Amino acid sequence: MVDKDKESPANAYEAAIQYQDRVLERGRTGKIVVRDEDRPWENTRQGRIRYFLNAAMYGDTALQEWRVFSQEIRTQSGKHRHQGGVAIYILDGRGYTVADGKRYDWEKGDLLTLPVKPGGVEHQHFNTNPDGPSRWMAFVYVPLANHVALHLKQLEVAPGHAQARGENND
């Protein structure tokens, strides 16, 4: 985002210094507590997600180097492949993840980790909780994700995504 009231930097070095100053200022003045009610739930290709930290959407927090989101798995997530480097803490429920064809069961209190590996990790998450959706928090350290050339390839969308967006799957 460009602030038209500010003077453009004279060169790349000055632009880098200005960027560092903005990062430091955001660390001093950005939100320390992100309230649940301040972030909306969204229906995405992966399912129902609420982002708490996401620099692409929210520049109001003291930390910008992390992508942190809560996901609710009602039946199953979308299937996709990307570089790993993701830690997922299970908040409620139980289920399993199929990663590169192998099943990994999880439940409340577990930590699911997707490794960084050549070619990425193909995975999909499933809820087996008969009492309702499973829910977790996912943590992605963005500098690492960018360094390993993060790329997401969607293989299947979560149930209900097309209907939520008014799309037709034909």
Where are these regions (language model features)?
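Hydrophobic/aromatic beta-strand elements that line small-molecule binding cavities or substrate pockets
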Residues: 67, 110, 123-125
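Conserved short histidine dyad/triad with adjacent acidic residue
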Residues: 50, 65-82, 115-120
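A short hydrophobic beta-strand segment most commonly corresponding to one strand
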Residues: 88-89, 113-114, 129-149
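Short histidine-centered beta-strand/loop micro-motifs
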Residues: 76-82, 105, 124-128
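Residue-level detector of conserved, well-ordered beta-strand and adjacent loop positions
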Residues: 72, 91, 107, 115, ...
